[in-house]
């Protein structure tokens, strides 16, 4: 199965409880935090709930081991 890189780009301030819980379920805790998840219907459903708070891109082999970006 393919994988997705999901990055939180907006804050949860003002977000509904279901949206906050969806971010936690995906493993996202802060802005610019990225996670790699399998591309399956369950993950796509969680992404649909918080699509305005995250960016989604296909995960390539070079980003598979990173938990986030460091500057």
UniProtKB/Swiss-Prot annotation:
Keywords: Ribonucleoprotein, Ribosomal protein
InterPro entries documented for this protein: Ribo_uL30_ferredoxin-like_sf, Ribosomal_uL30_bac-type, Ribosomal_uL30_CS, Ribosomal_uL30_ferredoxin-like
SUPFAM superfamilies the record matches: Ribosomal protein L30p/L7e (SSF55129)
Family annotation (Pfam families): Ribosomal_L30
Gene Ontology annotations for the cellular component aspect, listed alphabetically: cytosolic large ribosomal subunit
GO biological process, alphabetically ordered: translation
GO molecular function, one term: structural constituent of ribosome
Superkingdom in the source lineage: Bacteria
Subunit structure: Part of the 50S ribosomal subunit.
Family: Belongs to the universal ribosomal protein uL30 family.
Name of the protein in its database record: Large ribosomal subunit protein uL30
Gene source species: Mycolicibacterium paratuberculosis (strain ATCC BAA-968 / K-10) (Mycobacterium paratuberculosis)
């Amino acid at each position: 199965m393919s994988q997705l890189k999901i990055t939180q780009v907006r804050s949860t301030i003002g977000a509904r409880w279901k949206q906050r819980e969806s971010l936690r379920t995906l493993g996202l805790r802060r802005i610019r935090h990225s996670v790699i998840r399998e591309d399956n219907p369950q993950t796509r459903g969680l992404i649909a709930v918080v699509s305005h708070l995250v960016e989604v891109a296909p995960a390539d082999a070079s980003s598979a081991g990173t938990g986030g970006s460091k500057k």
